[in-house]
Every structure is written in structure tokens, then in C-alpha cells.
Amino acid sequence: MPIMYNTGEWFKVRPDYYRKVELATPDWPLDLDLEYMWVEVAPYGGPLAVTRDPTKLVPVKGNARPMIRIFDTTGREMGHILWNHGKLIAMGWSDMEELICIQENATVFVYDMFGREKESYSIGDEASVTKIVEGKVFQSSAGTGVAVMTTSGRVFLKQNSSKTERKLPDIPNSSMNCSCWEIVTEGRNSYCLLGRDREVIKLFPGETVGTITANLFEKPHERIIKISVSYNHQHLALYTNTGLLWLGSVDMRQKYCEFDTGRKDMPLQMEWIMNSDNSEADAVVISYPSYLLIVNRNADRSDFPYDPVMFLVAEMDGVRIITQSSHEIIQRLPKCVENIFAVNSQEPASYLFEAQKKFEEKSYKSDEYLSMCREKIDLAVSECIEAASYEFCPETQKSLLRTAYFGKGFIRNHNPDEYMRIMRILRVLNTLRHERIAMPITFKQFSHLNTEVILSRLVFRKHYAIAIQVAKHLNLPESWILEHWAYHKVMNDPNDTEVARKITEKFKNPSVEGISFCNIASKAHQAGRDDLAIKLLELESRASLHVPLLLKMRKFDRAVGSATQSGDTELITQVLLEMKMHMMLSNLHMTIRDHPLALNIYKKIMRESNRAGLYGIYNTEDDQKAIAEYHFQNAIETEGLESNLSMIGNAYAQGRCTLEAELCADTSRLIKLQKTLSTKYNVSLNGLSIHETIQELLLIGELKEAERIRSEFKVPDRRFWWLRILTLSSQHKWEELEKLAKSKKSPIGYDPFVEVCLKQDNVMEARKYIPRCRDNRRVVWYMRANLFNEAIDSAFEQRDVHSLFELQKNQAIVNNGTLLSKVCDCIAMLEGK
């Protein structure tokens, strides 16, 4: 069944498939090296907080004061915090995308994503006196909380600034140091799990002392060094100093597996991969320097070489991986996606997908595939719609939705609501994932957050235009977005004039309904800014309130100004017609000269009603460019362009429009030349561009004439070579194409020669030019030409192991034992070296 290009990132951890999806390629600032940084990432595609890692030796550049920099997922800096407080112990993000920073003296500072401080509070006197050694920011049903461990080994929890801190029970034998700890949320309660030697200690609120669980591992080890709790707080992973991994339920009553990783080095992070289908966790991701290991509950594994430094971010349906050069997500493959794209899939959705492809190809096999899934076609359509929601690639989404659209035509009384809903959401998701917005969330995350939260996050990031479009697309009210923007301006911008100007520009669109300056003026008054409130009232742009009154008062200068600010062209036209009736033309011109939009509309009115009068305006203003355009339009309408080109060019020259004047001269020369050549060679060249003229001459074999035009009109060598190559290949003049390639060094390289040969299905000719292509392109061209033997040799000569691996996966090579053996031998030789 269908094998899509995106299956290349699938991998199996028996019995399930997982996939690694690239979300973006971050463009970090040149001075940011993540290897030396402490990074905290917000979930749901949120921002990153980055500061120097105090445990690493970092060359200090510039200001030596600690700084926390905040980036979005594309590497664009959103803000920064000059840390002028005490020692920073921990950082984390709240569910409201607030950065929470925990200081050594138990003070918590809260910042927004732009680095602006919002509030600060203390975790309590006892924690403040004894000092903090570690801290955690955790999520619960009650919101975001903070947990700290003091130098005395006590753990305190605080849900938010308004709640009282809670002290967890004492740690048994607290003189012994704990090596790791984590916070677990159970309903509305949160408790702590600590790893100490070979024990796990549970500190539950309300108890006097913690409870100890020991002997979880069967194999010998010295101590537990890492604890990881799944996103849903139902599963637990423990990692020992000897590389043993224990997976089980968070209450430690059920053990899934015990796995020996065989590694003695310290893991960087360990996170559970949540299942997007049923919110379960089936595997953990463990990161080491330059290495990533995935182990599931069945003790099966998969591993990848990776960047030396990486950061894992637990999500509700996967784990994001951020490195210096990549941003990816690892997910368990949704069952519906596997059903469609898995090799040899026998599922109805897979047959439907293939049927739709064959239907587009107009193949009779479409009906054969349809017959295989007709009994369960409703299930197939549902799976295609669901699979589209899980995909990140827009092309794959389109393919799946086309399949669903195709399939639902065979279902009587099919309800299209789900299809339309998913299509709308996917358009929103693709917009959010764009680098400009940088919110790479999944469909499941979008559904969990709900659209109101998404819109709020867009508004807070000041993506007001996108938020409005999303609201429109999802049939949600948009007025609150504009009101939020205006209120934000009123509260934060001290310049009354600037605020009034910005609000006017935003609200001048006549499509905006339900909002007036009166509402914003009222808020300005509530904020004690009466001057601004008056300005906002004066700037009301709706015709029923301001402009008609100004016209009645004959305040034409203010009327045209208000109408122009409103952006309503019909209103401006109404004002101009009134002015024309009651003012002398000279005064009217003087009034509207300071309002370019009104002036342009007035010219449009004159153009439609009095062209001669329009020419008089241009002469009065000595606007030579406009005069040239006036003559140009007249020439086109009267089909007298050739005879008027000289006059038009002179007008452009007087208006200092050098480029336009030169174009007129060139056009005149070209027209004359085309007439001569048309007569000489009995072909029609009239009305063609320079490019098309040269192409026609090449097609009839007049190379010298083409060379002459190229020289006279300064056609670049690259374009001319392209024209020759395309022309020769379209006429199958392969010997002349070869002569051209050998005549001198090609200014466009030799890739185009290969491309045109392959376009004409002439592999033998393409083979001649591939050796002359750049080294890094030869393997690609050999593969496109299905010259797999040469591709293998070329990749081996270039020591390109990556290309050899790609060749190894090629279906044609897999089916050819000789070629497959050759690829494997080459890989073995290169890796052996």
C-alpha cells in the first residue's frame, strides 16, 4: 500500500511505530551556544528561557552580569532579563507562559515572555532562612506551582502567590543526601518523590514522615540518579548510576520492565513519550551527549546519534527535542496514520488512499481499490480525516483530505461537519506553525488548549492581525481582540497623540463592527487620561457621526481629513463631490494636496468624467511622470503606442524617471527590430518580449540573430544559455547540446543540462553531463536517472555515507540483490575507516 515520503522518519520500538518530525530549523543568534547554556522550554510550542549554565566554564563576552534571554522556537529573541537579584536556583514556565525564576533566598520572580516583571513572592520564612539548593516548577489541576528543597532537606510547595506554602513531611534519615527528586500531581494534591541510594521516598502532604520504597531493581546498582514522571503523572521512570532503567506505575506497585542501557555516562534528560491516541505513556526518551535512546515498556529500544547538546521538552502527545541546529518532535505514530501509510497495510483507509491516487491518474485500478474498502468506506474516510489532523506537512494534509473528500462521495447522507472542522483547524495550525508566529503545536494540543487560549496567546504576542483572521476563520467573535489591543495601548503608551493615531489606523476599516471610539474613550477616562479620551472622541471616523456634520459646517479641510483617516473611499468620494460643488477648483486643489489618498481619488473621478481636465491638473503640478502615464494610457487605448513612445519617453526623462525612459527607448528599438526580423524570416515576432523573441529565433535556427539581440539588449549569459539549452533539448538536438556544453565553461553549471535531458526522458544524454556537475549533486542526479550503480560509485568516491544510506533504502536497490550488496559493502568500508 502507499509509501509516503514522510515514512522515512518512522522507526519501530516493538511492537509500536514512532516518528520523528522536524518542526523548524531555529536560527539562533551567533553569540548563543546552547552547549554552555541552561535552557528551560515552555510546553505547547511556547518560548524558551536561556541563561549561562553556572556549572560550566563559559567564556564571558560583553556584560558580565547574568542575563536571561527569551526566544521563540525559531530562535528569534523576544526579550531579556538583566538578573540583578541573588543566585538563580531554578527556572520554569507556567501554564500562562510566564517565566518563573526561583532565587536562593526562596523568592520567586514572575516575568512575562517579553522579560517584563509581573510579580514576586516568597515561599516562606523557613525556606528563606535555610536557603534553597534546588527548585522545580510543576503543573497541576490547580495551576502552576513551585517546589523547593532547602539545605536542611525540607521540601516546600507553593501553588501561587496567593496560596500559603505547604511543608512536606520529613525525609527519613535526612542526613543522607538525595540524588534526584520530582513532583507528582494526583488530583488536587501534589507530592514529592525522591531518589536516595537504592530507595525511592514519597513525601505526601499531611503525613509526618516520608515512606520508603526499596528493592525496585533486580540487578545490582549503587544509587538512583534520575527520576522522570510522565506528563499525565501516572508513570514513573528511574535511572541508576550503572545504566539500569526501571519503568512502572507512579505508585510503584506495577513494574513494566527493567532495562540495562549498557551506558555508564550520566544522562542529560529523561522524558516519557505520551501517546496521542489514548493519553497513555509507552516509552521514555533518554538523552546523552551526542546520543538519544528510546526504551518502551516492553524493554525494546531504538537509538539515534544526535547533536552534542540537546534539550527535551515533555508534551502531552510526544517529546520535543531542541538542539543548536534543529527542532523536532518524537511521537508514537497515531494508529490512523499507520493504517494508511504502513507498508503492506490492508486497512480500508489505505485502500481508499490508493484508490484516490489512481483516480487522479485516471487509472481503472481505482475501482479495484475501492471495491476492497467499500464495505468500510465510512471508517476509511474518518481515518483519513483524523490522520490529516496529525500531520505537519501541508502537502500530506491535502492528500489525506482529498482522499476523504473522494471517499465521502460514496457514502449516502454523509455528514461533512467533521471534515470542515478539521480543515479549518489545519489552516489555523499551519498558520501557527509558520516561523513568523513560531507556535508549533499539534492538533491534540490545539484541542486541549481550546481556541480562546490560542487567540489569547496570539494577542499577547501582539499578533493581532493573525488573531483576527483566526477568529474569523473559526467563526469566533473578534471585537474583543481589537478592544484588548486598544486597551493595551491606552494603558501602556504615554503619548496621547500616538495612541490616538494608532487606534485610528486599526479601527478605520469599515468591516470592524461593534466597536467605536466611544468605548475606548471610556476606558481612557477610567484610566484617568481625559485628554486622550477627548482625542479619541474627536477621531470617530464613521460617517454618521463626524463627516456629515463637517460637511454641513463647510469645514471641508477637516472633513476631507477625517474621511481620509477613516480609509472609507466611498466617504472620501462623497466629500470630494461636495467640495467640487461648493468650492473653486483652485481652492479644492490646494485643500486636497495635503491628503494623498483624497488627491488620488479625485484624480480617479476626473479620469472617469473629464480626462482633459485631468491632464490640466498634471500640467499645473508639472507632474511629468503622470503626464507620461496619461499619454501612455491614451496610446494603448488608441493602439498608437509605437508612434507615441518617443513622446512618452521624453516625458519620463523630464520627470527624471530614467528607468522608464530607457524602457521606452528599448521598446521602440525592439519593435522596429521585430518588424524587420518578422519580414526577413516570415515569422510573427510582434508583441513578444526580448526573452520570447530570442527563443523564437533559436527555434528557427537563427543563432546569429539571437546572439545579436542578446548583445544589443544586454541579455545576461545565464539567461541566454538557459534559452539555448531548453530550445535544443525541446528539439532533441543532442549533438548540438553537447557541442554547446564543450564550447566553453557553462555560466550556469551543468545541472541544467542533466535536468533538460531527464525532462525529455533521455538518460543516455544525461549520463554525459552528470560527471561535470558539482560533487554534491552527482549522486542526486544519478538517482533521478535511475543509474543506481553510478550513484553508488559516486557516493563512495565522495565518502558520502549519508547518500549511501539513502540509496540503501531505495526500493529499486532493495529489490536488486547485487546493488544492495554493493551499497552495504561501501557503507561498511567507509564506516570501517
From Swiss-Prot:
<dbReference type="GO" id="GO:0005776">
    <property type="term" value="C:autophagosome"/>
</dbReference>
<dbReference type="GO" id="GO:0033263">
    <property type="term" value="C:CORVET complex"/>
</dbReference>
<comment type="function">
    <text>Core component of the class C core vacuole/endosome tethering (CORVET) and the homotypic fusion and vacuole protein sorting (HOPS) tethering complexes involved in endo-lysosomal vesicle trafficking and lysosome biogenesis. The CORVET complex facilitates docking and fusion of endosomal vesicles during endosome maturation, acts upstream of HOPS, but is not involved in autophagic flux. The CORVET complex may cooperate with the early endosomal tether Rbsn-5 to mediate endosomal fusion.</text>
</comment>
<dbReference type="InterPro" id="IPR006926">
    <property type="entry name" value="Vps16_N"/>
</dbReference>
<dbReference type="GO" id="GO:0034058">
    <property type="term" value="P:endosomal vesicle fusion"/>
</dbReference>
<dbReference type="InterPro" id="IPR006925">
    <property type="entry name" value="Vps16_C"/>
</dbReference>
<comment type="similarity">
    <text>Belongs to the VPS16 family.</text>
</comment>
<dbReference type="InterPro" id="IPR038132">
    <property type="entry name" value="Vps16_C_sf"/>
</dbReference>
<dbReference type="GO" id="GO:0042144">
    <property type="term" value="P:vacuole fusion, non-autophagic"/>
</dbReference>
<dbReference type="Pfam" id="PF04841">
    <property type="entry name" value="Vps16_N"/>
</dbReference>
<comment type="subunit">
    <text>Component of the homotypic fusion and vacuole protein sorting (HOPS) complex, composed of Vps16A, car/Vps33A, dor/Vps18, Vps39, Vps11 and lt/Vps41. Interacts with Syx17 (via SNARE domain); the interaction may involve multiple components of the HOPS complex and may promote assembly of the Syx17-Snap29-Vamp7 trans-SNARE complex. Component of the class C core vacuole/endosome tethering (CORVET) complex composed of at least Vps8, dor/Vps18, car/Vps33A and Vps16A; unlike in other species, Vps11 is not part of the Drosophila complex.</text>
</comment>
<dbReference type="GO" id="GO:0007041">
    <property type="term" value="P:lysosomal transport"/>
</dbReference>
<dbReference type="GO" id="GO:0005764">
    <property type="term" value="C:lysosome"/>
</dbReference>
<protein>
    <recommendedName>
        <fullName>Vacuolar protein sorting-associated protein 16 homolog</fullName>
    </recommendedName>
</protein>
<keyword id="KW-0472">Membrane</keyword>
<dbReference type="GO" id="GO:0005768">
    <property type="term" value="C:endosome"/>
</dbReference>
<dbReference type="GO" id="GO:0006886">
    <property type="term" value="P:intracellular protein transport"/>
</dbReference>
<keyword id="KW-0813">Transport</keyword>
<dbReference type="GO" id="GO:0097352">
    <property type="term" value="P:autophagosome maturation"/>
</dbReference>
<dbReference type="GO" id="GO:0035542">
    <property type="term" value="P:regulation of SNARE complex assembly"/>
</dbReference>
<keyword id="KW-0458">Lysosome</keyword>
<dbReference type="InterPro" id="IPR016534">
    <property type="entry name" value="VPS16"/>
</dbReference>
<dbReference type="GO" id="GO:0003779">
    <property type="term" value="F:actin binding"/>
</dbReference>
<dbReference type="GO" id="GO:0030897">
    <property type="term" value="C:HOPS complex"/>
</dbReference>
<dbReference type="GO" id="GO:0009267">
    <property type="term" value="P:cellular response to starvation"/>
</dbReference>
<dbReference type="GO" id="GO:0008057">
    <property type="term" value="P:eye pigment granule organization"/>
</dbReference>
<keyword id="KW-0967">Endosome</keyword>
<dbReference type="GO" id="GO:0031902">
    <property type="term" value="C:late endosome membrane"/>
</dbReference>
<dbReference type="GO" id="GO:0005829">
    <property type="term" value="C:cytosol"/>
</dbReference>
<keyword id="KW-0653">Protein transport</keyword>
<dbReference type="GO" id="GO:0008333">
    <property type="term" value="P:endosome to lysosome transport"/>
</dbReference>
<dbReference type="Pfam" id="PF04840">
    <property type="entry name" value="Vps16_C"/>
</dbReference>
<keyword id="KW-0072">Autophagy</keyword>
<dbReference type="GO" id="GO:0005765">
    <property type="term" value="C:lysosomal membrane"/>
</dbReference>
<dbReference type="GO" id="GO:0160155">
    <property type="term" value="P:crinophagy"/>
</dbReference>
<keyword id="KW-0968">Cytoplasmic vesicle</keyword>
<dbReference type="GO" id="GO:0016197">
    <property type="term" value="P:endosomal transport"/>
</dbReference>
